Amino acid sequence: MSDFTHFNEQGRAKMVDVGEKPISQRIAVAAGRVLVSEKTFGLIQSGGMKKGDVLTVAQIAGVMGAKRTPDIIPMCHPILMDGINLELSLDEERRSVEIKATVSCDGRTGVEMEALTAVSTAALTVYDMCKAVQKDMVITDIRLLSKTGGVHGDYFREEN
């Protein structure tokens, strides 16, 4: 079990001690999408959803989600984030809401989980705001696009 950083000698879960790691700038970018019907797409685009401006509310929810990441991911460290930016856009060809989150900090641990949680929360908010019109929306392709900083080096996803 000693090869696994999130388990102690007894095989029980533990939070990794990052106290000895050097502080470095960390940036993570994540993305995802919500596939919607033509009707739902039109209502989002025109601002006609009864619950309000879907993209603005989802953007705010994504920021809130990033800030709450250690509350819902058990072994995630609470960290002081320097910035959280969500970009939501409509893709007519895919008929989707495209979501991208960028999270940054100067710290001892990365912000990948915060970026992924921001995207997930924004996507769930899109679903919540549109579910009265459409129940079969699909939340999909939530993924880490890149991460920089830290001892494990940089990562950049190759998109097809």
Model-derived features: where do they sit?
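C-terminal binding/interaction regions
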Residues: 1-55, 60-77, 83-160
